[in-house]
């Protein structure tokens, strides 16, 4: 038998019982027109989703527990990353070529989002991972000049202005506020992807556009 949905007032009163390793799904925040964030991690070429979100028997039991999974994020590259990312509030990751290659696991985007990552700037992205970042509310940008990768160092305070206008134009500017230097970055997004990011991810976008 097909059961019709409960009326809204009854549905709101339904209590969802979760096991100890099932936590509520995290949601990103909508983008303001300016993002100021710390460069919390710089990685090289061919970073895989296994680097970002390791797999294996130790981690598998927590697949529905994003807060617990966050303790393992990028730890194969930098064991201090989870704590530093949470402390930074808003964070940016800089990567080399083919960032996010390998398994298409969504956790490699959802977990960094939970840790406060708002943007990844790379020389290039693996296509599926770039789409997952967008759905998680993380802005994927590519260097217009790949050599600019060398100039950015962890700990820098970075700013991106006029995000809405820049998304539509396909170009934004990344500014190192302490060094006073700016770097052009490319923003290759469809109109729908722009709307998803501005809403703070696919879940927020879907809620806004639900009938």
Sequence positions of predicted segments:
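Fe-S-dependent hydro-lyases/dehydratases of central metabolism
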Residues: 1-211
């Amino acid at each position: 038998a097909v059961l019709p949905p409960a009326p809204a007032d009854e549905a709101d009163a339904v209590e969802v019982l979760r096991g100890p390793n099932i936590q509520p799904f995290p949601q990103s925040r909508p983008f303001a027109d300016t993002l100021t964030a710390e460069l919390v991690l710089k990685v090289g070429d061919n970073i895989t989703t296994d680097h970002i979100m390791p797999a294996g028997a130790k981690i598998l039991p927590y697949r529905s527990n994003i807060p617990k999974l966050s303790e393992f994020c990028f730890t194969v590259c930098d064991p201090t990353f989870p704590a530093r990312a949470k402390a930074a509030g808003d964070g940016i990751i800089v990567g080399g070529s083919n960032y996010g290659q390998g398994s298409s696991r969504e956790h490699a985007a959802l977990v960094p989002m939970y840790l406060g990552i708002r943007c990844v700037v790379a020389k290039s992205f693996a296509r599926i991972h770039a789409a997952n970042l967008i759905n998680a509310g993380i802005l994927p940008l590519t260097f217009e000049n790949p050599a600019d990768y060398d100039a950015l160092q962890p700990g820098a305070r970075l700013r991106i202005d006029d995000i809405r206008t820049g998304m539509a134009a396909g170009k934004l500017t990344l500014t190192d506020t302490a060094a006073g230097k700016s770097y052009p970055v490319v923003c290759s997004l469809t109109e729908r992807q722009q709307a998803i990011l501005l809403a703070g991810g696919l879940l927020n976008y879907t809620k806004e556009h639900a009938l």
